[in-house]
Amino acid sequence: MTGLILAAGASTRLGEAKQLLVYQGQTLLERSIRLAFSVCKEVVVCLGAEVEQTVPIIQRLKVEFPTLSYLEVGNWEKGMGESLSVGLRTIDQNKDVLVLLCDLPFLTNAHMKNIISLANSERAIVASFQGVNSPPVFIPASLRTLFNGWSGDQGLGKFWRQNPMLCEIIHFSDKFRDVDVPEDREYWGI
């Protein structure tokens, strides 16, 4: 299984690069990479807006995680769907993929392991935090073609809304709180 971290956005609502924010001694990008490697053999990071600042983080972590790589999403401004589509096309089509975002500081290795414990070849596994569906999302190789041609601001929500029979929801009691606006940064003490 390959981890795919979507970290190409410009963080316009936050006003600064969320990938570079430090939480518990690590940037949010580094934290996401470590979480992905807790269950994945290789990880690909989609970069865009902050490539000059994020590539050095990835290069430093390659010493610890030799199967870590990144790709620059040319049209990252189009939205998350563009990064998702480009990232999925880059990864071998025969591999299952775990999609993560880099702005979810509440995620733990236990969340990753619980999601992967339900992995199968026929259904996507979607995390739900107190009723809010969100990545991480496990996508089996058999469903990956459904994402071909995605672009724009089509996140994964479109997938689980249009294909409920192809998704299994794993419920967590944790509150969903990402890092999107300055108030979120204050909430997390970042």
Question: What would you call each of these model-derived segments?
Answer:
Residues 113-161:
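Flexible, gly/pro- and Lys/Arg-enriched active-site loops
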Residues 3, 149-190:
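Conserved alpha/beta core of the MobA/IspD/sugar-nucleotide pyrophosphorylase nucleotidyltransferase superfamily
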Residues 15, 30, 144-147, 183-189:
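N-terminal/domain-start segments enriched in small and hydrophobic, helix-friendly residues
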